[in-house]
Amino acid sequence: MDDNKRPLYLPFAGPAILEAPLINKGSAFTDEERIFFNLEGLLPHVIETIEEQASRAYDQYKNFSNDLDKHIYLRNIQDTNETLYYRLVQNHITEMMPIIYTPTVGMACERFSKDYRRNRGLFISYANKDRIDDILNNSTRQKVKIIVVTDGERILGLGDQGIGGMGIPIGKLSLYTSCGGISPAYTLPITLDVGTDNPHLLEDPMYMGMRSPRIGGEEYTEFVEAFMQAVHRRWPDALIQFEDFAQKNAMPLLERYKDQYCCFNDDIQGTAAVTVGSLLAACKAAKTQLSEQRITFLGAGSAGCGIAEAIVAQMVSEGISEAQARKQVFMVDRWGMLQSNMPNLLPFQQKLAQNCDDITSWDNFSDNISLLDVVNNAKPTVLIGVSGAPGLFTEEIIKAMHSHCKRPIVFPLSNPTSRVEATPKDILHWTQGQALVATGSPFEPVVVDDVTYEIAQCNNSYIFPGIGLGVLASGAKRVSDAMLMASSRALAECSPLAIDGEGSLLPKLEDIHKVSKHIAFAVARTAIEEGHALPTTNELLTYAIEDNFWTAEYRSYKRTAF
């Protein structure tokens, strides 16, 4: 029997039910439920359907004039009645995605302490490092299957937001549910409060986190280790997603734990998966292969290098050598293009640095090769921005790229919108509508010479909900590189532009449930093939995906003994 139709037996009654967002139905409680659960007189007389409630909520939502107020309003509904919240979001997913997540969630993180209203998730501070097990036991969610955790040090492109970073795990898990059908009862946002180095927060009397500099070194490593072990003891099968950790910690934590626990880093691996999926779709639309492209990155941090490594892996799978693939990828950071003779390169950057002997013939060869120099010499067909610095894809750079590439692929992926390397409008006008553009944040369609171009949002929300659903449906114990690659290929298979030769590079958000299920199947099948999940048939796997897919419908309640 469908869980959404099976009665739920509750051992409590009265106002407590109305204060529990996972089970509150508000005006939708039936006459029978109002009698049995002592709710008579606590609600208006009329019994409403969830659609009637959602219609009223949407009317109220439209009364707010700015995005932050809309975000706060939706969060209040989420903290009051989660089923209604997800029905409302699912009814207006394209309109509300930028409100519940990027770019609006960035403002919410900056104002987290000032706008704080109600608890959600867990805050685990370093001061309580010896009581992590007790804190996990205090969670209102008992059957946790997906955790998103941050330490708040690198929130979007906004830097250290301390515990204000909690807005990101809350928002990400909202997308796991609204896009991937993960029951909100199975999700838990967690913030590790290890202090902050943001002077504005340290001086802010309203700041609600630890007012001390961030811990680091062995103290930090041991604290995260204690957290991971405690989570594994409490919920041994939970999927853990690392979110918005600083570069110096993100890759080491991923390398340390990816083979120990079922975990992944969305900034590194999720971003890489959705970017590769988008590139595969663009290549398919252009009737070419990724291994034929020359790719330049602006931004050589953990996210950029993670994408680059995923691209190299895909190129190798298409038949070229790893050495050749790396010669076709050019990484540029604030000091110029990464070269093998540069000092102080991080380990994950060293593998992507160009050999100096291969580029000595370039014009303007020096120790500091600019992005424009790379475009003029390497003649890239793909340009990807993950720098967090706005406006760096200049008209000169885009036109130089277009001069040697008829249909340049340009992905300014930095979030939020204020940090984008160039707007789609500028890129398309500079290339007379010839560029294939995808962005990290949402943008309106662009009109060039009476032709309207839909702007694909190369957002991780296309990928991680499907990964989560695939892990849950298969019971996978790890998230492997092959599973992530499978998610990229599955996403590319859903591209309207690749399928029909027209439309957006990525599917419409209205189709996200179909996309997530398609990705979930590919991820789960790969997990089984690699031995990370128990064998099953395709038919049973499809059934498991549907069985795990939660929809925003009210269940009937029955009273049980206290």
Curated annotation (Swiss-Prot):
Keywords: Metal-binding, NAD, Oxidoreductase. One of its GO terms (molecular function) is metal ion binding. Pfam families: malic, Malic_M. It catalyses: (S)-malate + NAD(+) = pyruvate + CO2 + NADH; oxaloacetate + H(+) = pyruvate + CO2. The record marks 267 as: Important for activity. PROSITE patterns: MALIC_ENZYMES. InterPro entries: Aminoacid_DH-like_N_sf (IPR046346), Malic_enzyme_CS (IPR015884), Malic_N_dom (IPR012301), Malic_N_dom_sf (IPR037062), Malic_NAD-bd (IPR012302), Malic_OxRdtase (IPR001891), NAD(P)-bd_dom_sf (IPR036291), NAD_malic_enz_proteobac (IPR023667). NAD(+) binds at residues 154, 267, 415. Divalent metal cations. Prefers magnesium or manganese. SMART domains: malic, Malic_M. The keyword NAD applies. The keyword Protein transport does not apply. It comes from the Bacteria. One of its GO terms (biological process) is malate metabolic process. Belongs to the malic enzymes family. Homotetramer. This is NAD-dependent malic enzyme. It comes from Shewanella pealeana (strain ATCC 700345 / ANG-SQ1). The gene is maeA.
